[in-house]
Structures are given as C-alpha cells and as structure tokens.
Amino acid sequence: MTDISIPAGDDGSFSAYVAKPAGGGPAPGLVVIQEIFGVNQVMRDLCDAFAAQGWLAVCPDLFWRQEPGVQITDKTQEEWNRAFALMNGMDQDKRWTTSRPPCRGCARIRIAPAKRVGRLLLGRRLAFMMAARSDSDANVSYYGVGLDGLVGEAASITKPLLMHIAEKDQFVPAEAREKVLAAVKGNPNVTAHVYPGVDHAFARAGGAHFEPEAAELANGRTAAFFKQHLG
C-alpha cells in the first residue's frame, strides 16, 4: 500500500494511492474515484479492502491541479465548504482525463500486470462518463449526482455500468432520478438499483448517512459485478 506518481500527459503528474493484492501476480485493475474529500483515509481503506479481495486498486488525486494531496473528512462544516469549493472549481473534462491514465495503464505504471480494468465512482458523474466515453471494461457509480445532465450520452454506453441510487438523496431530486432511470431503461449494458429510504453517501462507512444494510447490499452487488466482468 503506497502512493505513486503518474504522468498526466498534458501538464505534469499526479499522485495516486495504490493497494496491491497479496501474491504480486497479475490482477484485475480497479480505478477507485475519490469523493469530494480527496484521497483520504476512507478512500485508502476502501482500496485496501478491494486489494484484500484480489483487486489492484488505484485511487488518483483528482484535485492535483488545484491543491495536491487533499485529505479531509465529512465531519465539520468547514471541511464540507472546502470540499464543495474544490469540486465546483474543478474542470470536469480535465477531471475525466485524470482518471484515464490509471485505467489505461495499470500495467504501464508498474504496479502489476493488470488483466482487465474497471472503475468505481463514489460521488458524482465520472463512472457514467467513463462508461460512455472510455474503453474501461466495467464501471460502477454510487449515488449519481448530476447524471441528469448526461442523459444524452446514455445510448453511448456500450460497456457494463452498475448504478447505485439513493431514493432520498438530498442532492438528486426525484425528477432528476426518474429522468436518469428513463434514459438508461432498455440499455442491456446498464443495471440500476434504487435503495429505498436512504440518503446520499449511504455506503460511506462512518458517514452521517451510513446505512449498514443498504451498504452491504450495494457493496455485495459491486463485488459480484466486478467479478463477473473483470474476472
């Protein structure tokens, strides 16, 4: 478990936390996209948990152009304010390109010779964008904030996408949720689950809206999904 540096290909390099499975042999690569709090302990623990299941987990720092090395929590209003400022100040297209190098080259960054690569997004829109725009083998989206602005790309999703949506998400109005579900309905590559009665970040261990039963169900589905599509 370590931090590495990855060339961005445009204007520098960024760090990423890497958790490798035991044994050191080939393993499917999993790019874990951070929440708005940076590559903090929650994200590192999540990567470690995936590595324990046999995945090569990489969590890139998406805030590196603004403020490298952000690690904050969701425990105070000041931290929330800082997190939202970072998120709102980010160039979404560059955020997308930052997530591509780890996905394209888990072998190239000399961690391990990855066989297949997937993405897990804890937060907003990136997994949906990657499913529509990239060559990653499988993508998982938690919570789905802002997806209603991407429904025009739903028909472009040709790789497996699993979506976990909170019914009572304070950041996703019911109208927006239904718009997204209608857009992906009928696409055989998309599986969407709505979790009744839970709020945003219901799967964030230790978070204010953590719901153990819903989290266990969602995380179990995620593990099975990646096992099916990444091997």
From Swiss-Prot:
Gene3D superfamilies: alpha/beta hydrolase. It catalyses: 2-(5-oxo-2,5-dihydrofuran-2-ylidene)acetate + H2O = 4-oxohex-2-enedioate + H(+). Its EC number is 3.1.1.45. The keyword Hydrolase applies. Transmembrane segments: none annotated. GO terms for molecular function: carboxymethylenebutenolidase activity. The keyword Nucleotidyltransferase does not apply. The active site is at 169, 200. Keywords: Hydrolase. Belongs to the dienelactone hydrolase family. This is Putative carboxymethylenebutenolidase. It comes from Azospirillum brasilense.
